[in-house]
Amino acid sequence: MNAGATSVRKRSAGNFVLCDQGLEMMRGAMAAAKKINSKMLWTPHLGSLALAHARAGQAEAALHLLSEALAAVEDMGERMFEAELHRIIGDVLLSVQRQGEAQVEFTRAIAIARQQQAKSWQLRAAISLARLWRDQGKMVEARELLAPVYGWFTEGFDTRDLKDAKALLEGLA
């Protein structure tokens, strides 16, 4: 990332959040790619832009981009990131207090990841749903969901996802 792009980020709660200028840069890059009909990794790029909007407090813009990403999944058949897109939708919905809809998206993400045998995506979605259930007081359900998924992994325990899963499971004990 160049110095100009780096300067438009700010650090917040362990995550980078793009300021307005950074969002504009991302939108410009996406528009340029679209203009030349470059669709390589289009859905994850839309997902990243949606996350940036969500972190900037622009949930509706994020949901619009995620809807566009899911339409691209259908149009192009680029399903590799489909489960993650549903998980991100769930996170955005949670940010605007739409827990029921978020749970549906997390469950859908888990089902898609399971069907694709995408264990990392399934772990992420299980973490998100387990957090929601924990926050709703459903400790047993959260643990029963997450523990077996976490148990599949035999390496990579220094990754953010596995660290998050371990910490969540310890909190559910």
Name what the model sees in each region.
Residues 1-173:
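Helix-coil-helix junctions within alpha-helical repeat/solenoid scaffolds
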